[in-house]
Amino acid sequence: QFQLDRPSPPAPHVAAAVDVVSLLREQLDQHYEVRPGDGRPPASWMEGAELKRYFSSFRTADVDTVGFGYGSSWGYAPLRERLRVLLLERSITAQPDGLLLTHGVNHGLDLIIRHLIEPGDTVFVDDPGYYPLFAKPTLAKAKIIGISRGHDGPDLEDLAAKLALHRPKVFFTQSLAHNPTGSTLSPAVSFGLMQLAE
């Protein structure tokens, strides 16, 4: 009798990651009239609503999307255009379709890690640092190495010593209002970081 070999089940971290990706894709899917868990009524219920009349007093190009739905997963188009102009004023050329707005730092960090970090990569982080960050490279199977954080930023001697031993793919540090210390990079430490990065 012919018997097919069944593939072995995926590793637990892979299964969990696939489940999360599937859930994220479902959240971005916008073909449902009523989206359970969204907390917003169907668009047809909002026609003629007092809230819609209130929003129509603003100078918005698309009143129907303001406050009633998620809109583009890339972010609010007029804001992306405004950011393009602000970047251009700083001699940075960008197009609105090349700008992605995130729902906050955790969303941004997650996107960066998913696209840049491979299993086995080394990642430097502030120590102490922003603890919600630490699980993300761990899930990506990266090696996390802490860089001592002082009152004026990362300890440059510690960073230099660890750079001599490791080749990090990225160093996650926070320049202003560091979490949890509240410290801000001094100009000297900022310059030192630039020199070490070269």
Where are these regions (language model features)?
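N-terminal basic, amphipathic alpha-helical segments
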Residues: 1-56, 195
